[in-house]
Amino acid sequence: MGRAWNAFLLGFGALLLAAFCLAWAFVAVVLLAFTPAGTGRRIGRCAAMYAFRAWLGAMQTVGAFRLDLAALDELRGAGALVLAPNHPSLLDAVFIVSRLPEAVCVMKGSLLRNFLLSPAARLARYVPNDSLLRLISRAAPELALGGQLLLFPEGTRSVGTLGAFTEAVGAVSRRTGVPVQAIVIEDESRFLGKGWAFTRIPAFPLSYRVRLGRRFEPPSDVRAFTAELERYFARELAAGMGEVPAEGGVMAEPATRLRG
């Protein structure tokens, strides 16, 4: 595709997503004031799922994205989980939330105070990551209700290679007794990774594949678990599309290769 078309796709995607967020923010403000917490939680999470799904569908229709996210559907109805994906892009949470109605995002405190994102995030009862203790205290009741906590082990986006893991995933799993589900995101570009300028135009179409990895039981040793999880992701990402034998835990069936 030519540069002008790529620039159009970038602008189209950004404006459409901003329009979705702005429209829903106004609705969420009203719902926050007039709906009970449980009702608001369900509405907020379902709205996020369908809005992100609609946006991704539009981006596929115009030829900007090629996506294989079907593996995530296996997690519907799976009960409480700590979802632990690698984090190559700002789009990672969008991919996961678009398929899972019980996803509970862990967000920076500054984003939860953003006028565009705050109403929807508070309605869905998303969790701030200002401190580990606060994260655990806010995540525990959501997990007890069957939520699936989306928590990136790297803590921030990567810069093309896997970043160092924090102990947050293991700490939450240990304190709540909820298993950790590894999610592997394969990204053929570095679009919206750490250091990618929002005005930088990528070469569309962009291809993404999400597949399920091992499911880890709650650890007794958080530090050892974190090291094991980091090694696991390093092997999976190095293997690319290949399947790597599991070392204990549950390996999901591999997803199909990128379509289109």
Spell out what each predicted region is.
Residues 30-50, 61-62, 77-131:
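Catalytic core of membrane glycerolipid acyltransferases/transacylases, capturing the structured
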Residues 56, 96, 117, 139-140, ...:
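Short amphipathic alpha-helical segments and helix-helix/interface helices
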Residues 65, 126, 178:
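Short glycine/serine/threonine/alanine-rich loop segments
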Residues 75, 120-121, 142, 172:
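Structural alpha-helical scaffold elements that stabilize or flank donor/cofactor-binding regions
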Residues 56, 80, 122-125, 153-157:
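Short, basic, glycine/proline-bearing loop/turn elements
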Residues 4-7, 133-260:
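Non-catalytic C-terminal accessory region of glycerolipid acyltransferases
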Residues 1-81:
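Membrane-anchoring hydrophobic helices of lipid-metabolizing enzymes
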Residues 70-86, 116, 138-141, 179, ...:
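Alpha-helical membrane-embedding segments
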